[in-house]
Structure formats: structure tokens, C-alpha cells
């Protein structure tokens, strides 16, 4: 069962020169829709193609070319909305957002201001120690991406690459529910995790497939609660938007430095201007780009080339029926079915590949032992070599085989680590490694008993001390394991030593 009991974390408080201030943050996340074709043309969305290779006549805004909606992009937006527990609008429409920029051939962007395809939803952002922030999603709308202007290829000229022009984006707009830099990064991380589970966006921030505009404002303690009670934004400070953030670390740094900038202005008796700003990570500062535009500045109007988008509830229901298991549900199942701790379940469900690998290892085996081997041994080794789980040289069947050898007392946990190392570097089968390398555990009580008796007889002083202090029995265990090359069954060794010392 999905357990959603949690406590709301305290907001981030920054001490100014005169008083304390709280942060209020909202985010607009631009997520590139996973689709082979663009939103209104059949041009490819392949990343890294030669400049201006993936451009159709529609993308280039050639005269007489009309947009045609990509149904799959609509389906992906609906799927995303359902994954965020959002309301799906059966009626939506596209509008023109008018502005001029060299990499926007049409002279406008096709977006959805008045009638977005997805309404209100939510994202539960866990912050550890039983705390979580429920961040409300105001809306999700579909829109076109712009192209890319390139200014560093020539000192006297700029260039334009239209490959990205017309690529489908989902703009996921949150309410101002985020209360600190860490929460902002955690929200973006959780949103990315959900989209990856859904298969609607790959979440690759480096390539620009996911980027965020971060709205930051400050308020005095108690003012946010007044806003919550009245939904009156006048209780909050003037917000500034930090544009095009594509790094979790930079998002946190930008929020912190922007909040401190606003605090300094207000405490000096000034007023914060509503504007769009850019974060400079080298100087760790935000810089003004332009005054913040409102909707009327873009002269939005319904796009006359596109009919309103009408979808049927039965189609939405069919998409909902085929949604994959999402992170929170998978995490709860791992805790319940495999007896895992909250931490282990979180690590293993961080991405689909890790979760799938663990389930394959744990099938028919002890879940806690499987989690221990996957997290501590496999993930630890992969991290050291900067490899992803998909590049693991040890298959789930091989790691499961090592666990089976431990469970059957064929090898000890210590020897199992040696087997894992050989398996990792050579790809050999664990059972074959144990057999050919002579690593099988000694379970013959007679042979172990002889080794125990020999160690006991050779160390009378240690025997006397161990009888007075039972904790010293571990020394004998170590000596027996050493004498048997680590192959003796530790459980049998402990039992025999305890028996001999009690005599």
C-alpha cells in the first residue's frame, strides 16, 4: 500500500542585516517531449545532427506551409498529466505568442495560454527524515521550442541552427509552493524521475531536454501563511525570474544568491523590480536581462491555422489504464514486498533500470540480501568507475547466482566478494568460478573441528582470557578462518569455538 504520511518541512530562512526572510519559489519546467517527430511537422528530433539538417518547410516558416498536430505529442502530454494526478482538459487550443528573435522564423511561437491541455496536478517531493513538500502543478501546456543562435563561431557574425525549432515542449508550471533551494532541486529531480518512468521526456539537462525558469521572491515570516489563506499575492514579495537553468547545483546557487540580492535591496529601503535575470555561475551572481513581460506584451491570440484540440474521455481512460508503475508506488511495493528500508527502496527506485535490475536479482531470493549486494557492492563499484547500471558487466542472473551460493552455504560472504570481483572483471559464471578456483566453503564439521582444536590447544592463555571475556572469542574465529584459507563455514566455526570455550 502507498504510504503518503509525512510532515511538511520548515521553509528556508535567510538572515538579512536587519531581520529574517523566507523564500517563495515557483518553477516553469520546459520538458522536451520524447517523440521522433516535431510538434507540427514530420522533421526529426534527433539530438546532435548537423546544423539545419532536421528542418522542414513548416519549421522554416516557408510561405504557404501549415502546421499539422502530432497526435503522439498530445498523447505524451496527457500521459504526463495523468502521471502528475492532474486534470486532463478534453478541450484545449493553441495560441500565437508574438515576438521577434532570429531563431524563431515564424515571428511567433505556437503555445497554449488560454486553454492548456492539462490542468492542476501535484508532485510529492520527499526531503528525508519523514518530511515532504506537496508542490501543486498549476498547468501543463504544449508549445514549440525555438532554434539556437550561435555567437562564438565567428567574431563578426552570428549563426542560426533551426534543428530545435518546432520540437515539442511541455511547459510544467508549478504554484509558488517551493520554500528553499534544496526543495527546488528536489522538485526538479522528482519531476524528472516521474517523466522518465512515464517515458515522456528523457530528462537530460545537459542536452537541454529539460530546463527550468525559476521564479524567486522573499517575504517576512508569517506572510506566506496569509497568502495561503487568501491566495492574495500582495502578501508575497516581487518575483524575479531566473531564465534557462539546466543544472540542479546551479539552480540552488542561483536561488540563494538572488534571494540575498533581493533582501539587500529591501533592507536598504529600495524596491525589487519584476524582471527576467540570468545566472552567472563563474561570478555566482544574477544579472538583469530584461523587464519581466506579461501576457499582453506578447499579444497572444488564437492560432488561426490550428483547430481547437478536442479529445475523448475514452482515449484518456485508455492511456490511464496503460500507465506504468510510478516511483512512489514502486518504492512502496519494494518496502512491502521485499522488507526494504525507506532509504534502500529510494535508491533502488531512483531510475527504472536500477529498479528492474534489482527485481531480477531479488526474484525468489531474500530481498534485503539482494538490495545489500546491488547497492553496496554493484552500485559502489559502478560509481567508482563512472558506469551506469545499463553498462554493468555483472548480469542480474550472475549476481543472483552469487547470492544463491551464499544461501546454500557453498561460499561465505567474504569469499562471495572475491567471487563478485572475478565475475565483474571477467564475466565468468559464479558457480564455475567457485568450482575451478577451489573457493567452495568447508562445511565438513570434522575438518573444522580439527582446526578449532588445534588453535585452542596452541593458545591456552587466550583461552583463559576468552572464558573470562566472551567477546575475545572472535580472535579464535579469525585464527580458524586464517588456517582454513577463509573457506570454513563461519557459522559452524562460531558454534564450535563457543562449545570448546564453555567446556
UniProtKB/Swiss-Prot annotation:
Keywords: ATP-binding, Ligase, Nucleotide-binding, Protein biosynthesis. It catalyses: L-glutamyl-tRNA(Gln) + L-glutamine + ATP + H2O = L-glutaminyl-tRNA(Gln) + L-glutamate + ADP + phosphate + H(+); L-aspartyl-tRNA(Asn) + L-glutamine + ATP + H2O = L-asparaginyl-tRNA(Asn) + L-glutamate + ADP + phosphate + 2 H(+). Pfam families: GatB_N (PF02934), GatB_Yqey (PF02637). PROSITE patterns: GATB. Gene3D superfamilies: 1.10.10.410, GatB domain, N-terminal subdomain (1.10.150.380). InterPro entries: Asn/Gln-tRNA_amidoTrfase_suB/E, Asn/Gln-tRNA_Trfase_suB/E_cat, Asn/Gln_amidotransferase, Asn/Gln_tRNA_amidoTrase-B-like, GatB, GatB_C_1, GatB_Yqey_C_2, Gln-tRNA_amidoTrfase_suB_CS. GO terms for biological process: glutaminyl-tRNAGln biosynthesis via transamidation; translation. It is an enzyme of class 6 (ligase). Its EC number is 6.3.5.-. GO terms for molecular function: asparaginyl-tRNA synthase (glutamine-hydrolyzing) activity; ATP binding; glutaminyl-tRNA synthase (glutamine-hydrolyzing) activity. Allows the formation of correctly charged Asn-tRNA(Asn) or Gln-tRNA(Gln) through the transamidation of misacylated Asp-tRNA(Asn) or Glu-tRNA(Gln) in organisms which lack either or both of asparaginyl-tRNA or glutaminyl-tRNA synthetases. The reaction takes place in the presence of glutamine and ATP through an activated phospho-Asp-tRNA(Asn) or phospho-Glu-tRNA(Gln). Belongs to the GatB/GatE family. GatB subfamily. NCBIfam families: gatB (TIGR00133), PRK05477.1-2 (NF004012), PRK05477.1-4 (NF004014), PRK05477.1-5 (NF004015). Heterotrimer of A, B and C subunits. This is Aspartyl/glutamyl-tRNA(Asn/Gln) amidotransferase subunit B. The gene is gatB.
Amino acid at each position: 500500500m502507498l504510504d503518503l504520511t509525512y510532515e511538511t518541512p520548515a521553509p528556508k530562512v535567510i538572515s538579512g542585516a536587519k531581520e529574517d526572510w523566507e523564500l517563495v519559489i515557483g518553477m516553469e519546467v520546459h520538458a522536451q517531449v520524447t517523440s521522433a517527430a516535431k510538434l507540427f511537422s514530420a522533421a526529426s528530433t534527433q539530438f546532435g545532427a548537423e546544423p539545419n539538417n532536421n528542418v522542414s518547410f513548416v519549421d522554416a516558416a516557408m510561405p504557404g506551409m501549415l502546421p499539422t498536430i502530432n497526435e503522439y505529442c498530445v498523447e505524451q502530454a496527457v500521459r504526463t498529466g495523468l502521471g502528475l494526478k492532474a486534470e486532463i482538459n478534453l478541450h484545449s487550443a493553441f495560441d500565437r505568442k508574438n515576438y521577434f528573435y532570429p531563431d524563431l522564423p515564424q515571428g511567433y511561437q505556437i503555445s497554449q495560454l488560454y486553454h492548456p491541455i492539462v490542468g492542476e496536478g501535484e508532485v510529492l517531493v520527499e526531503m528525508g527524515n519523514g518530511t515532504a513538500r506537496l508542490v501543486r502543478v498549476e498547468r501543463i501546456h504544449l508549445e514549440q521550442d525555438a532554434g539556437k543562435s550561435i555567437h562564438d563561431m565567428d567574431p563578426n557574425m552570428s549563426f542560426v541552427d533551426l534543428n530545435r525549432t518546432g520540437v515539442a515542449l511541455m511547459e510544467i508550471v508549478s504554484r509558488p509552493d517551493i520554500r528553499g533551494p534544496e526543495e527546488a532541486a528536489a522538485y526538479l529531480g522528482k519531476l524528472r524521475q516521474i517523466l522518465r518512468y512515464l517515458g515522456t521526456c528523457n530528462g537530460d539537462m545537459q542536452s537541454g531536454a529539460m530546463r527550468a525558469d525559476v521564479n524567486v521572491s522573499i517575504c517576512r515570516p508569517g506572510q506566506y501563511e496569509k497568502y495561503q489563506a487568501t491566495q492574495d499575492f500582495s502578501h508575497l514579495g516581487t518575483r524575479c525570474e531566473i531564465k534557462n537553468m539546466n543544472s540542479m547545483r546551479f539552480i540552488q546557487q542561483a536561488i540563494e544568491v538572488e534571494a540575498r540580492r533581493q533582501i539587500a535591496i529591501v533592507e536598504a529601503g529600495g524596491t525589487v523590480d519584476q524582471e527576467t535575470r540570468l545566472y552567472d555561475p563563474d561570478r555566482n551572481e544574477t544579472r538583469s536581462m530584461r523587464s519581466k513581460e506579461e501576457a499582453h506584451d506578447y499579444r497572444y491570440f488564437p492560432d488561426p491555422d490550428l483547430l481547437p484540440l478536442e479529445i475523448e474521455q475514452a482515449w484518456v481512460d485508455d492511456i490511464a489504464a496503460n500507465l506504468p508503475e510510478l516511483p512512489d508506488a514502486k518504492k512502496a511495493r519494494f518496502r512491502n514486498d521485499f522488507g526494504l528500508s525507506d532509504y534502500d527502496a529510494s535508491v533502488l527506485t531512483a531510475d527504472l533500470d536500477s529498479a528492474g535490475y534489482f527485481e531480477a536479482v531479488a526474484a525468489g531470493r531474500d530481498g534485503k540480501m539482494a538490495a545489500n549486494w546491488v547497492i553496496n557492492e554493484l552500485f559502489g563499484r559502478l560509481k567508482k568507475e563512472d558506469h551506469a547500471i545499463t553498462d554493468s558487466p555483472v548480469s542480474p542472473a550472475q549476481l543472483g547466482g552469487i547470492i544463491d551460493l551464499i544461501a546454500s552455504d557453498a561460499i561465505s560472504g567474504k569469499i562471495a566478494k572475491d567471487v563478485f570481483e572475478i565475475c565483474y572483471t571477467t564475466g565468468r559464471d559464479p558457480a564455475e568460478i567457485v568450482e575451478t578456483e577451489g573457493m567452495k566453503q568447508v562445511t565438513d564439521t570434522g575438518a573444522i573441528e580439527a582446526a578449532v582444536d588445534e588453535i585452542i590447544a596452541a593458545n591456552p592463555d587466550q583461552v583463559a582470557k576468552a572464558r573470562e571475556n566472551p567477546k575475545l572469542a572472535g580472535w579464535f574465529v579469525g585464527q580458524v578462518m586464517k588456517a582454513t584459507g577463509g573457506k570454513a563455514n563461519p557459522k559452524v566455526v562460531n558454534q564450535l569455538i563457543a562449545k570448546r570455550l564453555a567446556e
